[in-house]
């Protein structure tokens, strides 16, 4: 469980890219992030025909990725009506009664498609139970506009793909829901592929270095609903009344593109151990480095711990798009991320095995916390 140490600090255990780790948290008042901590990057030049323009964005991304690991992007090319319609669809879905939502339960899916109820997860067992509700979809090549013929996908790729319909069939009572979610998903697919090239440039690689790894990507959406919770941090995690919106964690794949409404609640752990607000900024997405990218850069890029706490008194919605290499691909440290004489910190690993390892690490953390409580 979380422990209080010297005056002014506390400690939590978190499952990280390197396994369970202990982080010291300063008990300072929550504050908004500084522009130097979470910068706003105008990414419109990534669509330019000029390589120098595209490299200028890549350098800004590199600076952010080696600092806090979070940044906002503006002029990203995703129309406002797409995010507004997906937001409206999310509210329409989550405001239904629980029995109706459970018809699309994720427990009916073989690959994490569908609805997850509140109080069923503890993303960080060192904290309270998560009150978040979510609706998730995973990669389906039938809605990937870059895939021409699903029947031509190689067998070694198809073994990791599940094309399911149940989560759509069980939300068909909402006529605009499927269309709105897919529109958001497809817009983020296009943006993520463009940003993947930006990340390649940021690592002094050829712009297309990662293209082959994201032909059939690990790409999923979580539509998240956070009811308001009281700001009562005095409760210990073992208290049955302890609740968090979603506990402290890092994301698993390469990077995340997050849309959030105007309510706020996303908190990022700064490098010096302070919780800082990644407040909503209109017409932007928040992008954060995830674990696989930290791994392949030999820890040069930072997958930063974050959480959500909705203390606003209002309902909150966020829509996270999680982007990674295809599960059939390999997650390997890049040679050009090694200084002369520097050794690789990580062995090569299949991306599906990497995902399973991260889930296992979270399970191990859960066991540790149970033993210490």
Task: Report the location of each language-model feature.
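Peripheral, non-catalytic segments flanking oxidoreductase cores
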Residues: 2-373
């Amino acid at each position: 469980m979380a422990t209080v140490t010297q005056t002014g600090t506390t400690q939590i255990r978190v499952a990280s890219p390197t396994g369970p780790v202990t982080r010291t948290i300063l008990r300072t008042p929550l504050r908004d992030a500084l522009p130097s901590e979470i910068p706003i990057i105008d990414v419109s030049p990534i669509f330019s025909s000029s390589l120098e323009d595209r490299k200028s964005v890549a350098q800004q991304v590199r600076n952010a990725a080696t600092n806090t690991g979070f940044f906002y992007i503006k002029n990203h090319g995703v129309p406002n009506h797409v995010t507004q319609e997906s937001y409206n669809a999310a509210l329409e879905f989550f405001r239904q009664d629980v029995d109706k939502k459970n018809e699309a339960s994720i427990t009916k899916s073989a690959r994490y498609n569908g609805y997850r109820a509140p109080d069923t997860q503890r993303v960080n067992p060192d904290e309270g139970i998560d009150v978040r509700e979510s609706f998730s979809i995973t990669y389906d090549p039938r809605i990937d506009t870059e895939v021409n013929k699903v029947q031509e996908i190689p067998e070694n790729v198809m073994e990791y793909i599940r094309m399911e319909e149940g989560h759509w069939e069980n939300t068909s009572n909402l006529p605009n829901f499927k269309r709105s979610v897919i529109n958001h998903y497809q817009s983020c697919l296009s943006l993520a592929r463009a940003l993947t090239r930006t990340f390649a440039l940021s690592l002094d690689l050829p712009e297309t270095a990662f293209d082959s790894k994201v032909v059939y990507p690990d790409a999923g959406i979580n539509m998240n609903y956070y009811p308001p919770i009281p700001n009562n941090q005095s409760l210990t995690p073992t208290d049955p009344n302890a609740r968090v919106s979603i506990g402290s964690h890092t994301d698993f794949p390469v990077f995340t593109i997050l849309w959030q409404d105007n309510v706020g609640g996303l908190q990022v752990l700064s490098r010096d151990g302070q919780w800082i607000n990644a407040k909503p900024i209109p017409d932007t997405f928040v992008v954060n480095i995830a674990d696989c990218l930290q791994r392949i850069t030999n820890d040069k890029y930072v997958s930063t711990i974050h959480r959500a706490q909705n203390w606003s008194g209002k309902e909150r919605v966020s829509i996270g798009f999680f982007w990674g290499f295809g599960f059939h691909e390999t997650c390997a440290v890049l040679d050009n991320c090694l200084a002369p004489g520097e050794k690789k910190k990580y062995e090569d690993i299949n991306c599906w095995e990497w995902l399973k390892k991260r889930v296992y690490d979270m399970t191990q953390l859960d066991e540790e916390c149970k033993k210490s409580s």
